[in-house]
């Protein structure tokens, strides 16, 4: 669907009425946050209408947002995965054929079935969404087992037709402290990259990284490992270089590409947020996803809008956003943040 068609609603019908009548919009309203159940609202959005989705659903059994129909407080991990699979099946329908999903998710440990301990007493809900201990027993898991939520979800989505393209590690130098003494403290979360189709939009150049100076020098000499010269040596493998070496094994500086493809470990620290949302991911994380997955002027969807980070970054980068948030207080918070009020 051409982007110029996505400028507003074709009928003056509220989202609530649209859902009640089981009707679907033929166009999509931009730069808006719909308040309500994400699954029901997604069902009212048109097919093939957004370029990408960047989101972080509530993690399993970590906190209670005090809302009916909230995701994350299911009795079992299987129920949690089932509900998210329903949501992302609708996301896949709403995405354009060349669209991508960037899904941030973290794991949880099984508890003992009694009152558990929070990791940081000063921040009982977590500074940055890092997983804390469960209080309830988990079927199929022993107490203290890591449940494996991220991969349970990744495989479930793959089974519904998504292409699982990347497991990106979001590494943090300032993770939430953990007082455990029988395992390493965790400092990372997962970002799964899914695509709707085999071929999809991915601007690898927009997120390319500088190569190391030593790598550039090695390429200039046309050397690989222990090979001494850039020119071929009889009886030895052809040396690696990014261009044909000159006669004495040198190539021009101008022939050196100073960039390399971005690696799948992203070092991005969390940032303080003074709003009343406990699990806001950093703007830099969203920026990287949008650079690669959403063209300028494109539309990004976030069905778990929270504090509005996705919408804020999209607006700053010349993209449009469509958000969904269950809690009306967070919707108000997100609008203020996107407008620069926070």
Question: What do the predicted segments below correspond to?
Answer:
Residues 2-341:
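Core catalytic lobe of class I
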